[in-house]
Amino acid sequence: MNKQSRLEELLLSWSERPSEDFSRSWQMRKSPSCGIIRSGPTTGKWCIFAPSSDVDQAWAKIKCAVEGDNLLFAKVSTALRSMGRDGHVICVYTQDWTDKQDLLHVREVLRSLGFVDELGYKRDIDTLKRIYGPDEWYLRA
């Protein structure tokens, strides 16, 4: 097999494991009770950063919590999206960043899954407006 064929095969390879999935940029899961969720002025996400060596195990925990209706919606960057980067990001969404009780509840669910290190929460409105760094609203917990 020539190099071009192997590269095409690799780039089109699908895997349930984010660290090996080159078929798409993100894998996503929605809870059974989740309706339509769209990024907008009130949505936001907890961001979990993981190296390629740990992302599959971390994503398995998040998927299980989403499918069990303990979390609303989540996505993970795949090998395709993470090429040239230090690792992966898992985003765990909430509907309304102004609902502090829900933000902290979701954070506690993540803590119960073993994500005990400090995490950051980012509003989608800042991402959509390309506001980064000191000008973005960012919660750490």
PLM-predicted stretches and their roles:
Residues M1-A141:
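Structured alpha/beta or helical-core interaction and ligand-binding surfaces enriched in interleaved
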